[in-house]
């Protein structure tokens, strides 16, 4: 009793398949020709690559071609052609009836021979056979890395920072860091240990801006100046002078003063050492950022000299200095010189750093920056393994310096508790968490607990009264 309906069902299915086949044929016959404006990718090997030439009409004898479909069957050679570019030469042994496009196609536009466009950090050049050749440099903003980090359970989110788009990873390392690793003698300088009182317990969270409101300054932007040595030093000194003067002096100190005037074994926007920066702040001092503003974010060209020093001072006795030059910023009159006492190194111990930070203010830390750090947007950073299987040029790192401002803990959705440091970078407020980042605490992540420095602002009673 089921025979008749089953036969009818099979007949209907066969009819539907035939209709779909006719629709497919109609779509091909009604499609516009692929080469009406000339053959694009005239040197491409399509039929030849697959060793495919088909007789008559064979709709399955097809290959993808620049977002469309091309064919290697005899039927393609009709008035409105949808043949693959090498069909005539490879299958028929004759020249193609359409002229090759004199240039290369990209995003609907034809570029002339030797024309170029940029694909992120790589330049693509149109060559004579209508083919693009692109550089293969690792880019600072790597969309594949961003996806891999955000798919993984790493505790932080990555994203595209528009200021980094178009830069190579090598340029990021060269221009966005700039702290030269200290010499072995400096790395071996004696560590200072603080003393925790009996039964003293440090809080689980602390932020310098909460203990010293209005005395902790926001991050600046070093741009493409490899001057983190100057920016982090000025940032820590600014906060410490403000704290130790009890708010009587709250300067944002000038990184440019260090970049241009601290020239002994320093390279300005091409890198510098922390010990040299602190020596200069102790012996010479610097003015405020308003008085001597950052003069530009592109001071790293090897052929261009560091901008000349525009701030000079003289000794006043007892180590104090007085400016002998007017402010480079003619709109500012105050050219007060700010100084610090000798810098000291903290023990490479989590609690030692916490105690110092809580009692005396933000500290300066050296750290190793890896390729994924540039992509940080939010969360608790730790270096990820997403680039481990890639060539060495995709796995780069360099030395940087930052200002640690606090610490805390966070419980993740899986129940794990992660301890972290809060730190201020020098890439501007658009990067990370309003210019700051959090990084795993207690395991020396990226060597951030290896070389940590503190200092006292040089503040006398005359300074308190003067200000």
From Swiss-Prot:
Pfam families: Peptidase_C1. CDD domains: Peptidase_C1A_CathepsinB (cd02620). Glycans are attached at residues 77, 160. The keyword Secreted applies. This is Tubulointerstitial nephritis antigen-like. It comes from Rattus norvegicus (Rat). Residues 1-21 form the signal peptide. Glycosylated.
